[in-house]
């Protein structure tokens, strides 16, 4: 929280503090609606003109016992005047809807931050379920923060006493009281919040009305008891945002939109063959809503079928996609290799999660990098891309589709649970401004001279002939093919040639140069990362630069092939540290690709994003060595 200036606004004894940024964390039981409250608050903030970055954090259990520590769900929102790169390490305002939430989440609140609690949920039975040893949780936890205690449950019950709703339904509205109070504390747009609720519950107007009534009660509560609250806050707007229309979007939705845009640009139908798996399922759900845009989705019987059906769709002339997470990629690998052998365009989306095996389904890691690069039998090169942020998922999904279509190859797109579920303010692009996509469809005049594996001499990719094109009938399959003719072949020299041709095609796909941020010319330390860690590494870079350290950042989004200038960039610096959410997979890969460099490592495998403060501490230690 960066204070810009302070002033009294004259509405009471409280002081309104003007801020450049502010972080709110909603927490409660998994059924308390913390994700909804956080999403509405982030959307309202984006509508107001602020930049945002969010972090939904929920347990891997389908439903832990109510009121227990293992069942706590949280949603953190970082609102800023200027560009916000991370959800923040700790919050300025914590909402704890019960005793368990306070016990597990207070450590995420800054020492000077405030905590809102529902005092009705701190009874003896609640404290016992939350594993307290005394009847004074504040003292037991050593909390020194300002506590805003509110009887939220009682107020909500009174508010909806005449609604005709049952008790369970009434209690589901508690999150809106907390949201209303937060909106008052931060001078947020209540009308925008109400409109979101009306839209969400459009088919249940009584539910919408109840939630809006409770939302207003929370806001009014703040107005009526302002004398007991030390500060209210207002995050300023007017930062250096590009003009245009913005929306609050999470990474999975942005990925879906990027794929739709690519299909539109290429003039193709979009096909998704998928099997539900956390945290990738929302891509399937989102694409299923857009049949009117030429999108076909099939929820298949298993992961293998999802990928195999997508290969079939690619043969049929569609932009073909299959979506999953790490465990699903294990199952899809043979079908992915079928796309390698047949040289058909396919986008394989891996929304990475904690592993191995079932692992941590709702948590984030980057541990599938080497799987994406090498996790198939045989010499099976695939382009591998990694999105850097929730909004970047749109552009990298579009780019993955473009590369797949133009170079007739399967492409792996890596995102992760953090950026897939987190959100940011997305500037909606015009379709005309996006790069052209030109699939290499066989032309009518090639009839007679065409063969199934005839290649474009410039790109090395074969031409795309689809069923129904007279004179271009052919078959494909997983057995090795003869060069050009596509006939089955076991001849040794032909296998070597085809292996080399497939590798050459992928290795020579043009990708943008690797850019360096920070003290690019005279840095003593270069930080290297990839994918969804960009925001945290960028924030750590800013912190180090502000203290006079000579550091730079090179963040990879194109992993295979690497940018042509990668070796040249890395060799400029005396020291290079690779920071990643795994045991060192990118560092190992770079050692294979770039000789003569000692790569230092900063690795974390906790199922959580990086902490900016810990990154700064670690990089400072490396600098001081």
Model-identified regions with their sequence ranges:
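Conserved thiamine diphosphate
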Residues: 88, 143-145, 149-153, 363-412, ...
